[in-house]
Amino acid sequence: MSEFQVPEIPAQFLPKHIALVMDGNGRWATERGMKRTEGHKRGEAVLLDVVDACIELGVPYLSAYAFSTENWRRSTDEVRFLMGFNRDVLRRQRDDLHEKGVRVRWVGRRPRLWRSVIRELETAEELTKDNTTMTLAMCVNYGGRAEIIDAARDIARLAAEGKLRPEQITEKTFPNFLDEPDMPDVDLFLRPSGEKRTSNFLLWQSAYAEMVYQDKLFPDFTQQDLYDAVLEYAKRDRRFGSA
């Protein structure tokens, strides 16, 4: 049972899709004289708490930025740790997620990923494919620009083969070429750590997302922080470009 009070928010004011940038793990560890990897380990439990909070609230879709296409620029040791860590998190948590009715989806590129990571991602997807409580999109080796470029290449290939006409590409049809065509647009873009940028995360899907930035580093993030962000979202007047 959560120690935090779950706010009562009418369904029409709840975000249907939360995009979460799990930022600040390394800084959290460094500030405490620990190895950066210790911050990532702490972040695992925090992510699971966020999943539980989404279930309590009735938020149907959560996307977690686990490893970006830019993270390959980090030190070899940290990249190696993150590959193994993402693999092991899925192995440790998939049964628990399955029992909670969470459907796991992988969003990201295959190239460069360890085969063992791909195997665990695909195993989690297969195990949980029929679950309906909520969807957790694990964004591993993901980049918003890379996703759009890959989609553009697929479209160009089909057009060159005479299978697609330019006028068939619209805002409604373009998402069919993205990594996860069924992913709903992001309603709430949430980033702890005090940084105020999107970091190449779900660029297409976040066109009209409400941004909420919080100062806590991710390992200190609690369910109450998520509730506060959702309460802030519920107060926003979303006009989608209209007056």
Swiss-Prot record:
It comes from the Bacteria. Substrate binds at residues 24-28, 36, 40, 68-70, 72, 74, 191, 197-199. Belongs to the UPP synthase family. Its EC number is 2.5.1.-. GO terms for molecular function: ditrans,polycis-undecaprenyl-diphosphate synthase [(2E,6E)-farnesyl-diphosphate specific] activity; magnesium ion binding; manganese ion binding; Z-farnesyl diphosphate synthase activity. The keyword Transmembrane does not apply. Keywords: Magnesium, Metal-binding, Transferase. Binds 2 magnesium ions per subunit. The active site is at D23, N71. Homodimer. The gene is uppS2. InterPro entries: UPP_synth-like, UPP_synth-like_CS, UPP_synth-like_sf. SUPFAM superfamilies: Undecaprenyl diphosphate synthase. PROSITE patterns: UPP_SYNTHASE (PS01066). GO terms for biological process: polyprenol biosynthetic process. Mg(2+) binds at D23, E210. One of its GO terms (cellular component) is plasma membrane. Pfam families: Prenyltransf (PF01255). This is Isoprenyl transferase 2. Its cofactor is Mg(2+). It is an enzyme of class 2 (transferase). Catalyzes the condensation of isopentenyl diphosphate (IPP) with allylic pyrophosphates generating different type of terpenoids.
